[in-house]
Regions:
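Conserved phosphate-binding/catalytic region of the ribokinase-like
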Residues: 114-249
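Acidic, amphipathic alpha-helical patches
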Residues: 41-42, 89, 118, 159
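Structured loop/turn residues at beta-strand edges in well-structured enzyme cores
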Residues: 44-47, 87, 94, 125, ...
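Beta-strand->loop->alpha-helix junctions that form or flank phosphate-binding loops
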Residues: 1-10, 81, 121, 131-134
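Short gly/ser/thr-rich secondary-structure transition/capping motifs
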Residues: 31-37, 78-84, 112, 205-207
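Conserved N-terminal subdomain of the carbohydrate kinase-like
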Residues: 1-50, 245-249
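Conserved beta-alpha-beta core of the PfkB/ribokinase-like small-molecule kinase fold
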Residues: 50-120, 137-139
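Proline-centered loop/turn at the N-terminus of a beta-strand
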Residues: 13, 75, 98, 128-129
Length: 249
């Protein structure tokens, strides 16, 4: 459930959008609430999940959640947004299994402006799947076996608002990845199941993903992010599956 601090204020973001380009500036007022408490209910959710998705906020709580995920084999997915990297995030990034970050984060974390090299460095530092997003220029990936992939962008004639493009990219990628993990898991739940397949956790399943499935997830995410720029706000322009499929073709 939601933890409520009755005497505190929630964080508030004011977003200004440039009408001609859809570029935005964010002014953020931090919450005055105390750090959320890590509860037994959180632990149980993580233990039953394929993926724990984090973004670097509420770090004490996040580290507790990551510890549980590592213990039970739940995949840790990190969204490294622009202007969000600091030295404290280095260890968190290295401890995450899926690391998909914005260009700004990647450059600060790796020390290079070459995004293909940055993606490779992220992978070499521990990420099973490494990704760097670069807005209208597309994205770069390195899969679990070290194979590189360049995901082309879906260019739009006009961009209304880029708010939420990164969040929608992450959500869409993990949506498609989870579908693949479920499909692989269902394949083990057959009459041929043995002791090895019984012990498979989410990280084991991630290693079993085919390149084609991962590329489809990246393409799907790119399409969702592109369509999400066609309206004001981060949520209201989220597209339907029909619109996504129509764009991908």
């Amino acid at each position: 459930g939601i933890q409520v601090d009755a005497d505190a204020k929630s964080g508030t973001a004011t977003i200004l959008v440039k009408q001609k380009t859809g570029e935005r500036a964010v002014f953020f007022e931090r919450a005055t609430a105390t750090e959320p408490e890590f509860l037994e209910a959180h632990k149980q959710l993580i233990e039953s999940a394929y993926i724990l998705h984090i973004n670097g906020r509420h770090r004490q709580l996040m580290r507790s959640a990551m510890a549980v995920a590592k213990e039970v084999g739940t995949i840790i997915s990190l969204d490294g947004g622009a202007q969000r990297y600091d030295e404290d995030m280095k260890a968190i990034t290295e401890d995450s299994h899926i690391v998909i970050v914005a260009r700004d984060y990647a450059e600060k974390y790796t020390g290079t402006t070459n995004l293909e090299d940055a993606c490779r460095i992220i992978h070499e530092r521990g990420a099973l799947i490494a990704g760097v997003t670069d807005g209208a220029n597309g994205s770069y990936f390195v899969w679990t076996d070290g194979t590189s992939y360049r995901c082309e962008p879906f260019s739009q004639a006009t961009v209304v608002d880029t708010t939420g493009a990164g969040d929608s990219f992450h959500g869409a990628f993990l949506y498609m990845l989870t579908k693949t993990l479920c499909k692989i898991a269902d394949g083990t739940n057959t009459s041929t199941m043995n002791e090895t397949s019984l012990s498979l956790n989410a990280i084991d399943l991630l290693h079993s993903c085919e390149h084609e499935d991962l590329e489809k997830a990246a393409t799907f995410a790119s399409a969702v992010a592109a369509l999400n720029t066609q309206g004001i706000g981060g949520r209201s322009p989220l597209p339907s599956l029909e619109d996504i499929k129509a764009l991908i073709g």
